[in-house]
Swiss-Prot record:
This is Elongation factor G. Catalyzes the GTP-dependent ribosomal translocation step during translation elongation. During this step, the ribosome changes from the pre-translocational (PRE) to the post-translocational (POST) state as the newly formed A-site-bound peptidyl-tRNA and P-site-bound deacylated tRNA move to the P and E sites, respectively. Catalyzes the coordinated movement of the two tRNA molecules, the mRNA and conformational changes in the ribosome. The gene is fusA. Belongs to the TRAFAC class translation factor GTPase superfamily. Classic translation factor GTPase family. EF-G/EF-2 subfamily. GO terms for biological process: ribosome disassembly. PROSITE patterns: G_TR_1 (PS00301), G_TR_2 (PS51722). It comes from Nitrosospira multiformis (strain ATCC 25196 / NCIMB 11849 / C 71).
Length: 696
């Protein structure tokens, strides 16, 4: 089957935003204008097409990134048909893992900003993640019709807070309830969308007289930005003093793809204004798979390899999401980076070392599906029938194996114990939790060896609430949830050299393991590092992996209160062995003995997770909020002003934040909101550490 849409006309994009910037409504409008959904879904009444899990509809927040395919020919039908795959990303801070994993497989993004709230905490997090994956993006300033809307303030915040270079290609005509449309700075025309057709039709008019000067000066800035793309455009601009619309678009495209600028547009998705022009900007400025650098990976031999976005290359894809569908079972969403895959093909998963057969291939529109026969380079689809694959796994041609770069997922910071309400549901709960952990790599399940309880861990209270909620809805298991527990860690603060001996030689086959190790503090976040510095074979080569294993098996249980040990560098530098009695187990035990002894001597400390907290509160309650955060051992990092609101930024230990939502509501009559995300681990003060250790 030949390719229907040339790869240059593909756009794989995400819509990213802070929780209330209007991301879901914006995505809904995209689906409406591209002709996929005929009734506009509104988040306000819980009917949005993309939010297809029930809880999302209740809470009005987007949780799972669904991938949807749609087509666009331009607002004026003046482009050839383009195929846009939209990966819906959540805007709630407990779900940053979902955002991270969708960013991994998209080529460009539309960041939605609220014209009133501007750059909010979650926007900064998502922006940092997009920088990490070098994703080119557009900025869409939404909610221009709301009281307090201010396009220029958002422009300044993108510069000051996100350290980005926004280039407005539109200006709003009016604001708040007077918002009528936009000035297109490339055409120098005013665009008004027609309310009766829900924005399907529009007309171009002259720019309002009171805006002409402003529009000229912003156009000048935009043309200068475009001219800086290359010498040819710069020379044209210097000679002629202007650039043609095609040249402006070319220059802005080059610079957007290089992540030098962010084209900036505006509108009100809810009022059906502006999203249509944003779709045109997706075609004009965001990359096709062919514009993206080849993806890196490695061959089985460990050599570096890469794949280009071409049908001619061997098949390689990345599984980025697992979802359970009530009708077809487990779906694996994957992005094809190179080659072609057909339903019925056998693919190889190098991470699991297994071949698997792809049953059916589906393309999704939110949660409706269309069966397809094949999927080609640059496209996104869902496969049925893959039993082994999980998020982050590579799928490739068995005849040409490549492993694409793995995704790195953060460690959970909060634990709770769960037990089924009825003993009969114990097994059912185990199945449900394992299925949910497969779908979400930032959620973990384990059984506590001492108490026998089931412990679930995640990125925040909301994250775990939703897991418990899904268990009830999707698997019919009701659970009781214990009080949340903080994921403390242990570390060392001084370097020590220690000896570990495991010797049993009383007749018969004995045991003999003997090591000297140096333990020192590693850089924060570096984790455990093992260095083999044995000279002259004092510990034979074949026992060195056993030493490392002995150390790694001791890490989960520190000496202070049994918490995992992090950020420690261990160098094996000496030891001895016995020709007959030495074996792997003896060296493993010797390493473990040395490590425990070293921990006690190396000034062990307790680390606690610190959270970055932002509170938006009416100015009258500012004192209460700051006082409350300080009483929770919070360090105030700074304050900002928003219209009628104060924003307090603080760093607070997670242990002090439980139940914060309730106390914030009562301290501010329910008028303040907050967001919280994990920042880093920090040493717990002595009195706090002693209290935790004494409880163990």
């Amino acid at each position: 089957m030949a390719r229907k849409t040339p790869i240059e006309r593909y756009r794989n994009i995400g819509v990213m935003a802070h929780i209330d910037a209007g991301k879901t409504t914006t995505t809904e409008r995209i689906l409406f204008y591209t002709g996929v959904s005929h009734k506009l879904g509104e988040v306000h009444d819980g009917a949005a097409t993309m939010d297809w899990m029930e809880q999302e509809q209740e809470r009005g927040i987007t949780i799972t990134s669904a991938a949807t395919t749609c087509f666009w020919k331009g607002m004026d039908h003046n482009y050839p048909d383009h195929r846009i795959n939209i990966i819906d990303t959540p805007g709630h801070v407990d779900f940053t893992i979902e955002v991270e994993r969708s960013l991994r497989v998209l080529d460009g993004a539309c960041t939605v900003f609220c014209a009133v709230g501007g750059v909010q905490p979650q926007t900064e997090t998502v922006w940092r993640q997009a920088n990490k994956y070098k994703v080119p993006r557009l900025a869409f300033v939404n909610k221009m019709d709301r009281a307090g809307a201010n396009f220029m303030r958002v422009y300044e915040q993108i510069q000051s807070r996100l350290k980005a270079h926004p280039v407005p290609i539109q200006l709003p005509i009016g604001a708040e309830d007077k918002f009528e449309g936009v000035v297109d700075l490339i055409k120098m025309k005013a665009i008004h969308w027609d309310d009766a057709s829900q924005g399907m039709r529009f007309e171009e008019r002259d720019i309002p007289a009171n805006m002409v000067e402003d529009a000229k000066s912003w156009r000048e800035k935009m043309v200068e930005s475009a001219a800086e793309a290359n010498e040819e455009l710069m020379n044209k601009y210097l000679e002629e003093g202007d650039l043609s619309p095609a040249d402006i678009k070319q220059g802005l495209r080059i610079r957007t793809l290089a992540n030098e600028i962010v084209p900036m547009l505006c509108g009100s998705a809810f009022k059906n204004k502006g999203v249509q022009a944003m779709l045109d900007a997706v075609l004009d400025y965001l990359p096709s798979p062919a514009d993206i650098e080849a993806i890196d990976g490695e061959k089985e031999s460990g050599e570096h390899a890469e794949r280009h976005a071409s049908d001619e290359e061997p098949f390689a894809g990345l599984a980025f999401k697992i979802a359970t569908d009530p009708y077809v079972g487990q779906l694996i969403f994957f992005r094809v980076y190179s080659g072609v895959v057909t339903s019925g093909d056998t693919v190889y998963n190098p991470i699991k070392g297994r071949k698997e057969r792809i049953g059916r291939l589906l393309q999704m529109h939110a949660n409706q599906r269309e069966e397809i026969k094949e999927v080609r380079a640059g496209d996104i689809a869902a496969a049925v029938g893959l039993k082994e694959a999980v998020t982050g796994d590579t799928l490739c041609d068995p005849a040409d194996v490549i492993t694409l770069e793995r995704m790195v997922f953060p460690e959970p910071v909060i634990h709770v114990a769960v037990e089924p309400k009825t003993k009969l549901d114990q097994e059912k709960m185990g199945i449900a939790l394992n299925r949910l952990a497969q779908e979400d790599p930032s959620f973990r399940v384990r059984t506590d060896e001492e108490s026998g309880q089931t412990i679930i861990s995640g990125m925040g209270e909301l994250h775990l609430e939703i897991i418990v909620d899904r268990m009830k809805r999707e698997f019919g298991v009701e659970a009781n949830v214990g009080a949340p527990q903080v994921a403390y860690r242990e570390a060392i603060r001084k370097s020590v050299d220690v000896e570990g001996k495991f010797i049993k030689q009383s007749g018969g086959r004995g045991q003999y393991g003997h090591v000297w190790i140096k333990m020192e503090q590693n850089e924060a976040g570096k984790g455990f590092e093992f260095i083999d510095a044995i000279k002259g074979g004092t510990v034979p080569r074949e026992y060195i992996p056993a030493v490392q294993k002995g150390l790694e098996e001791t890490l989960p249980n520190g000496v202070l209160a049994g918490f995992p040990v992090v950020d420690v560098k261990v160098t094996l530098f000496d030891g001895s062995y016995h020709d007959v009695d030495s074996n792997e187990n003896a060296f493993k035990m010797a390493a473990s003995i040395a490590f425990k002894d070293g921990m006690r001597k190396a000034n062990p400390v307790l680390l606690e997770p610190m959270m970055s907290v932002e509170v938006e509160t009416p100015a009258d309650f500012m004192g209460n909020v700051v006082g409350d955060l300080s009483s929770r051992r919070g360090m105030i990092q700074g304050m900002d002003d928003l219209p009628g609101l104060k924003v307090v930024r603080a760093e607070v230990p997670l242990a002090e934040m439980f139940g914060y939502a309730t106390s914030l509501r009562s301290a501010t009559q329910g008028r303040a909101t907050y967001t919280m995300e994990f920042k880093h681990y920090a040493e717990a003060p002595k009195n706090v550490a002693e209290a935790i250790i004494s409880k163990k």
